[in-house]
Amino acid sequence: MKTVLITGCSSGYGLETARYFHSQGWNVVATMRTPSEDVLPRSERLRVVALDVTQPDNIAAALEASGPIDVLVNNAGIGLLGAFEATPMAMAREVFETNTFGVMAMTQAVLPQFRARRSGVVVNVTSSVTLAPMPLVAVYTASKTAIQGFTGSLAHELEAFNVRVKLVEPGYGPNTRFTQNSGKRIEGLIPEAYAPFAQRIFTAFAQSAAVTKESDVAHAVWRAANDSSGQLHFPAGADAMALARPNS
């Protein structure tokens, strides 16, 4: 029976992905900064483990508690919405610590066991902002685009060890806590000069018919984790699929 470790499982895409892998008979290690047992079914095949991907000691402890794993899903991430001109560099660094360096740190930590076994899959969850540039998310886009390039390079680097590396690219999920938290972080990041432009962007998002559901992402992660071909990109959600089509 295979084991998957998924970061960022307290809500949204990570939570649904943990539920889906469990429903498919896998052992699941669901990690979150503040563990909450009641969001997932009670099962001998499911463990909730505390993990902050920005803390090296946390990563080491979580992997020791998890034991050997077959798949790592780097899902944990934070959003940031606002004009770049008004974004403090400290806030930009905070986004990169989780979205970029946290993914790299988790991946680096599991590679020794994958390489030794000559088996394993890393699935990095990025965003459809890497498929088409969007305004007011410059820092967030940069943090995810870095992982896009990192994943592509690493896929070639680890091929000789039979370790696969994949990208899942979700679209806009308006109902996720991730999106709600991004909105909370906007305070002070839309200067008056940007307000009319920002309002048009927010209105367009609110009227978007094609969006991404949590189940879209869970299924895409499942496909990526079980894919034995050389496919790298797995867009998730109707909007992401539409954006990816011109690039396919």
Task: Give residue ranges: language-model regions.
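A short, exposed helix-loop element centered on a Lys and neighboring polar residues
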Residues: 107-108, 152
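N-terminal Rossmann NAD(P)H-binding glycine-rich loop of SDR-like oxidoreductase domains
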Residues: 10, 14, 18
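Residue(s) in the substrate-gating loop at a strand-loop-helix junction
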Residues: 127
